[in-house]
UniProtKB/Swiss-Prot annotation:
Stated role: Toxic component of a type II toxin-antitoxin (TA) system. Its toxic effect is neutralized by coexpression with cognate antitoxin RelB3 but no other ParD or RelB antitoxin.
Species lineage: Bacteria, Pseudomonadati, Pseudomonadota, Alphaproteobacteria, Caulobacterales
Keyword terms, alphabetized: Toxin-antitoxin system
Protein name (database record): Toxin RelE3
Gene3D superfamilies: RelE-like
Keyword Lyase: no
A GO BP entry: SOS response
UniProt source species: Caulobacter vibrioides (strain ATCC 19089 / CIP 103742 / CB 15) (Caulobacter crescentus)
Recorded family membership: Belongs to the RelE toxin family.
Superkingdom of source: Bacteria
Changes seen on gene knockout: No visible phenotype when deleted singly or as the relBE3 operon.
Amino acid sequence: MKSVELGPRARRDLTKLRRWLLNRAPSAADRAIDLILSRAEQLAQHSDLGRRKSQNMRELYVSFGAHGYVLQYRVYPDAVVIARIRHSLERR
């Protein structure tokens, strides 16, 4: 089984997302973060779960409320590294 790691930008994205949610929907903040991390952990066994975005990047959509979040990740022989986490409506 592969390990799942948050890259530096993904860690910053998650912190920013949590801060934003705590200011607007405190009750949703922990649920959203828990769901994102839970879906990320599924990549340890199913690294091809997301769609291919480019030759070395995949995206996994995490449904939450009316929209959701997108996890961009790279798959390596022993690890899955989450590169970015963003809201599905966020500009790229």
